Amino acid sequence: MSNTIACQFVFEPGEYDDEFHLLDAQIDLFASELSGFISVHRWVSPDSRLMNSIYFFKDMESVKALAKYPQHLVAKEGVKRWYKSYQILITEVTASYGDGNLIYP
């Protein structure tokens, strides 16, 4: 788990359109093809108000490549159209504990 970077996109969904769905698919594909990509996980809060997309990467270079991806830059311009609110959290995972039966990410 050393050097793992977790990029969380926590958001309250708004109204999605065709452009959103196209960009979302393109960004997911690009992220998954980066050499440092580990996985992506999505969660919904118990009250279904918030969603969290967590992308795990092996290195910060991959995070920076995703941030500079042209389709990602286009999507950032549409956040007010597609989301009621959002927050980005980028963290370095320094430790991971468990019983060994759950492999995450």
Positions of predicted regions on the chain:
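Short S/T/G/P-rich N-terminal loop/turn motif that feeds into the first structured element of a domain
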Residues: M1-M51, M60-K68, K84-P105
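Arginine/glycine-rich "motif VI" loop of SF2 helicases in the C-terminal RecA-like domain
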Residues: G78-R81
